[in-house]
Amino acid sequence: VTAARDAVIAGRLEQVGPALRALSVTPPTTDTPVDWLPWLQEVQSTAGNGAVPQTLEAAAASVAALANACGDCHRATRSGQGGAAQGAERYTAEDRSGLAEKMARHQFSAEALWLGLTIPEHQAWSAGAEALLNIRVPGLVDVHGKPLVADRRPSGTGDLQGVRDPRLPAEAHAATEPQADVADLDAALRELRALGGRADQARTTGEKQRVFAELITRCGDCHAAVGLDLT
């Protein structure tokens, strides 16, 4: 399952299908409890349905649906990764700044939201949402990349739904071609911050599935566009 997820995040569409196909035909082990078999069949069916993705977006949707199916199984059978997420900690930037901090934050968010779906565990999901909704964007950091405002905690109440983030300054626009990449990055970071707000507000597994699919699609699109090799 994680192989398909990581392929989407890396922007490697050609690697997603084989990973999903392999999962769809993997037989259960001899010690698999009988009451797990219907759920295993559901997981394999979900993997098989997404085994021939035509776009990265479709691949991400299949991976997110698979994560949701895993979570349903773990919830019903009380299995899965046990208390793996019980000790989920909040994201901390430590001494990182700039691109290194952003990538560490994105990686933390993707992993925490994944655990929130697959275990499933609200604490992990909330930690991932909080990291995303506090992404540092131009105008909210000083010249050294340090935050100018305190992080927002997850609301858990729906207070932010449909409301523009009041802390975001006016969006930067590229006046000349050399500034285009800067403006594009600004816009991408704002979109991810808004996605964190949606993750914070997600209350159903379907909503969480859609948010996660959108997140890893954005990750994969960006990594593919800049030619970053994560393998």
Where are these regions (language model features)?
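Sequence context surrounding c-type heme c attachment/ligation sites in exported
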Residues: 1-231
